[in-house]
């Protein structure tokens, strides 16, 4: 399954990428900002997205809205669960809390995406 990673912290994005690859997913890109995410979603048309709930202090609800409109599955990977869940679009998705384990994220990706 083709998966896009939306994450503003490089090391976390790389960890997510490793877990997705171990789950059998194909990573089609990594976006670190809202505009970059929206462009990559349109260009790559991933089957699924891991979505950080908060990019550089901004909730990613607009990206979740775009994903819903395109019927693209997503799960939220965030360290700010309570803040993230205040956005109804983000609250409807599966949530993986940071810090996460490699095994936990691999299992979640396999269950929800691959």
Segments (PLM) and residue ranges:
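Conserved acidic carboxylate
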Residues: 7
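Acidic phosphotransfer microenvironment of two-component signaling modules
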Residues: 10, 32-36, 103
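Two-component/phosphorelay signaling modules centered on CheY-like receiver
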Residues: 10-29
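Acidic, metal-coordinating helix/loop segments flanking the phosphotransfer/catalytic sites
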Residues: 30-48
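Conserved phosphotransfer microenvironments
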Residues: 51-68
